[in-house]
Structures are given as C-alpha cells and as structure tokens.
Design a protein with these regions (language model features):
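Terminal alpha-helical segments
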Residues: 1-141
Length: 141
C-alpha cells in the first residue's frame, strides 16, 4: 500500500470511475441472482464492494496493488478506529471468502439461499456507505 502516487486530477477521475463501476457491478450481481448464477453473483457482489472500497481508499490517497492490500488498508484506515462500522469489514471479508470459494473450490457448491442472499443487503449498504464517503472526500478538496 502506498500513499499519494496519483495526481489529484487523476485520483478524482479514478475514484469516480471505480464508484460507477461498483454500482454497475452490483446491478450485474442482482441480475445474476435473478437468473440463478450463484458463482457469478458472489463474484459480482465481491467486486462491487471491492471497487467501492478501493475508491474510498484512493479518495484518501491510499493505493493498493492487491486484493489483500485493499482489505488490510480498509481495516487499518477505517474499521479499527471506528470511522466505519466493523460489520462492513465482516461483510467485505465474507464476500472475499465466498468469491474465492466460488471461483476456485471444486468441492464446495455455493448455496444461493444460505450463502449469497444473506449478503446482498449488507453488500449494498457497504457499497453505498463507502461510496458516499469517497464522494464527500473528493468534492471537499
């Protein structure tokens, strides 16, 4: 994780793009759920949250090159100090874990009802919360 590698103009553009991508990807997740595509739904839910969280980090001039870097910096910069409710961190970690399971585990079939659907609302709340924080941050500067 590094701090401040982007120019202010580039940072604002990247934040806007990632927030748009987060909301578009969330819609893809909902469509996948409606069509019964469990693994795709989990993948899209995770990536929607990932894009939103990474936008938040970038809005504060943090940049990560890995998924684990984003997860760790989110915890360090926003969860541990109570800026954001720790439940959002739990949601983000659950999404990451399920995404890995859906993408790479051959012996575990994800269940839409018990594993995916319970995360839809918390994922949306996470995305909306961090999106608003990122927007406020880039427009205040």
């Amino acid at each position: 994780m590094t701090k401040g590698q982007l120019s202010d103009t580039d940072r604002i553009e990247v934040v806007k793009y990632r927030l748009e991508k987060a909301h578009r990807t969330y819609k893809e997740a909902v469509g996948s759920i409606e069509n019964g595509y469990v693994e795709t739904a989990v993948n899209r839910l995770y990536y929607a949250a990932y894009y939103a969280v990474s936008a938040l980090l970038i809005s504060y001039k943090y940049e990560a090159s890995t998924h684990n870097g984003v997860i760790q910096m989110f915890g360090k910069a926003f969860l541990r100090n109570g800026v954001i409710d720790k439940e959002y961190g739990k949601t983000f970690n659950q999404l990451f874990s399920l995404r890995l399971t859906g993408d790479y585990e051959d012996r575990h079939i994800l269940d839409m009802t018990t594993e995916v659907l319970p995360l839809v609302k918390p994922a949306k709340e996470l995305i909306d919360t961090v999106s608003e924080m990122a927007k406020e941050r880039i427009y205040l500067e």
